[in-house]
């Protein structure tokens, strides 16, 4: 496991992430009914209280399903970092977590095809794997990620997503753990962004359409 030394003290990447999220949340404004992110306005859609309630529900199911197992959680950056931190705090299993990014084929922007998973530092052979994602919409990127991960011969692969847009799915995915299904609206907050902004909001907001 990678260790980072800061002021003479060693930290794992996960420890730094949890610390960062805790500090991040302390500086986040309290819930607001409407927010402005760059040139767009958004209204409150899902409160932090609702989000955390659903995360606890999902974590409880994961604890039950993976009892006596040691799963590997693969949290997909950038969007899932807050979700992953809150989820793992509710998981009481011996487990590992790796924060990964997806590398797309150059010039491909609509097919979702990826060529590799960057940052994976855990051997997945014969290990149960849980992919942690912020949102699944078309499902194309997730489907290709599954193809890439299967080449490492894990014991199993399950998908855990904070949000799912069933009306936008273009592929058949078996999503075992889903906190909430939502309509096909543009949203920000709790890790989700608009042009890089808005990830730091405690709640999830939906675009106000003119």
Question: Whereabouts are the PLM-identified features?
Answer:
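PRPP-associated nucleotide enzymes
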Residues: 2-9, 13-210
């Amino acid at each position: 496991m990678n260790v980072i030394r800061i002021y003479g003290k060693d930290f794992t990447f996960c420890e730094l992430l949890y610390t960062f999220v805790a500090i991040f949340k302390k500086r986040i404004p309290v819930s607001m009914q409407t927010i402005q992110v760059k040139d767009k306005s958004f209204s409150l859609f899902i409160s932090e209280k609702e989000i955390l309630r659903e995360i606890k529900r999902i974590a409880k199911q994961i604890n039950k399903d993976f009892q006596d197992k040691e799963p590997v959680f693969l949290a997909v950056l950038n969007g899932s970092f807050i979700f992953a931190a809150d989820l793992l705090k509710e998981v009481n299993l011996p487990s590992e977590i790796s924060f990964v990014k997806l590398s797309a084929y150059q010039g491909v922007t609509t097919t979702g095809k990826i060529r590799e998973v960057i940052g994976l530092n855990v051997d997945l052979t014969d290990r149960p794997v849980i992919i942690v994602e912020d949102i699944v919409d078309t499902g194309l990127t997730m489907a290709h990620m599954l193809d890439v991960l299967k080449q490492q011969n894990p014991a199993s692969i399950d998908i855990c997503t904070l949000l799912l847009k069933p009306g936008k799915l273009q592929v058949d995915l078996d999503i075992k753990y889903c906190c909430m299904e939502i309509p096909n609206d543009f949203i920000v907050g709790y890790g989700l962004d608009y042009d890089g902004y808005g990830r730091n909001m405690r709640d999830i907001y939906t675009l106000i359409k003119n």
